[in-house]
Each structure stands twice: as structure tokens, then as C-alpha cells.
Amino acid sequence: MTLAVLNPGGRDPDIVFSGGVGTPDLPQHAPVNFHAFAACSRGGFFRSVRSVPEKTSVVLLLLRKRNLRQALEALQTLRERGSKVFVTCKESGSHQVADLLGDTTRLELFSTLCASSNGGLTTTTGLVPLLRACGCPVVHHVPTPYPVDLPEWDFSTPFEKRRGIFVGTREFAVPSRNHLAAVVLADEMSRELDCPLAVMNTEGRRGGMILKSLRRKNPLLFIIEAPLPYPDYLRVMTLHRIVWQLDSSHVPGQVAGDALLCRMPCVGGNGEVDRVAFGGDGENTESAWLRARELLQNDHAWHTAVDESQARALEYLSFEQGARRLADLGAA
């Protein structure tokens, strides 16, 4: 079954994956987040209902704070065509969902969309009861797939060339990201273990000032100015031994998914991919801290963590498994 993913009014250009996901350096959107759903099913990602092929049988409709009215019009058009329409929150972190539904009008529109759909789809277990309570007749839980089963998306680096810590989070101002705490703890590990530390700066001058204040005491702290093209970002990540974060936002887990493509452990988050692939719950910072130190110093523990996470990813998160789970939407 091919899936059309529709993001009404979105900024990402239309893309069709009928020939597969392609290679990382193609000039197109990477197969991450909801593009991954389109890619693994050899479907398409669209920003206007007019672009969705007329005979599309199943559409995944992305709901955002600013597109709910457009989404409702699109849903009505698609249902009139005979398409099955499943709804989902485009941004599904706990703080993002609270922002989406923190207005009476938006909550009413969201509930109308849920009740008018064929069902809901969520990449996190935490949203299953919410979508059901808002009116979805059925809710499917499908973790975000990653192309761990496609050799061209293997960004691994030889173990002997890996060193240090890559901080996976950003956004100092979002409390549930715990980004500052993650950076400070990583800085301490870096100085104690004499290993490199890389942090992405996505917040311009303000973020740079915070990071530079830490770098004065730690010459091993490297500030990477964002944004980077996705393949280049992965090529930086894979030079390190672990990905470290303390994100408690209950997100789908893209950072952990990125770590899977780099064949490296991700420690400290409570996202869906963190939980499935790495056994993380993000609840105990002390345990995460000890685990990170172990993986930085114990080669056997590192290799075991990589082997186990890759096995779980192939079983539950691969493109092949994603396509199988999405086929259930067509049969629903």
C-alpha cells in the first residue's frame, strides 16, 4: 500500500517516493519524521489536497496549530473522493501537543477532525488515549520508521575513529528538552574523561554565548553552527562515541533515530525510538549519566549496545516493518 502524507499549507515541497527513498545526497527532503512514512510505503508527501493523486486510497493528514481549518477542508474533499483519511499531530512532543490544543477553537476543530476521520495514527504511545478521547474511531500506533535496513543509509564510522560525546538536543528555552542540563553534564564528562564534546547551536548569538562561556574552561568543546544538511549532520554525529540527551518531551525520537543510522548508542531521552531501540525511559538522570560514562570507557559495553539496538531497530523500526504496519491502515 502506498501512503499519501498531506500537510496542508506546509512549507516542504511535494515529493513522490515511487522509486524508493534514494540515496542520502539526493537534493530532496530526508526520509525522517513523516517523510519516512511516505518513503517506506513508496508514496508521497504533499502540502495541498490538489496535489494528492485522485485515486489515492489512504491519506495521513498532519494537524498543526495553524492549519486546522485547511485540514478540515482537505479531509472533507478526500472523504468525498473515497479516500480513507487518518489524522495525526505533526508535532507530538508533550509541550507541542499542549500548545496545539491550548485554545478552545483549536480543540473543537481538532476534535471535529478526529471524529470525521477514519482513525488516528500516532508515533508515540502517549497520544493514543488523547486521539481516542477526541473522537478517533480507532487509533494506530506506528513508531517512526528509519532506513536502518537500507545499506546506503548506513552512516557508521569505524569504531577506532570515534571519540567523545555528541549532544543530541537543542532549544535552551524549552524546559522539557533539558538542553542546558544535558550540555552542562556532558561538559563535566568531557573534562573528566578528556574526550571531545560537540554541541549544535541553533539559537544564534544567544545560544553561542552560553556555549562559549562553557568552552572557556573546556577546549574540547566544539560548537557546530546549524543548520547543516541532514547527511552532513549525520557525518558529524557519527564521529562520536555516544549521543547524549536528557529530553523528557515524550517525542517520537528523531535524535535516537539519527543515532541508529550512525550505528551508535543514544543515552538519556524518553522518546519513542529511545524506548524501543535503546531501552531508555529518561526518568533517571543518574542512571543515564552512569550509562553514558560506561559507554565512553568500556569498548565491550559499547559494541553490545550497538548490536542490541540495531537488532531491535530491524525488528521494530525498519522501513520494511514500517511498510507492513502502514498496510494495516489500508485494511482497516
Place the predicted regions along the sequence by residue.
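Acidic donor-binding loop of glycosyltransferase active sites
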Residues: 235-251, 264
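A charged, aromatic-enriched C-terminal amphipathic alpha-helix characteristic of glycosyltransferases
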Residues: 283-287, 296-330
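Short beta-strand->alpha-helix junction loop in the catalytic core
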Residues: 126, 141-154
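Conserved catalytic-core segment of nucleotide-activated headgroup transferases in glycan assembly
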Residues: 21-23, 148-150, 158-216, 223-228
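Extended catalytic core of nucleotide-activated donor transferases of GT-like folds
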Residues: 40-118, 122-129
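N-terminal pre-catalytic "stem/leader" segment of glycosyltransferase-like enzymes
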Residues: 1-80, 280-281, 324
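Nucleotide-sugar-dependent
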Residues: 177, 246-256, 269-278
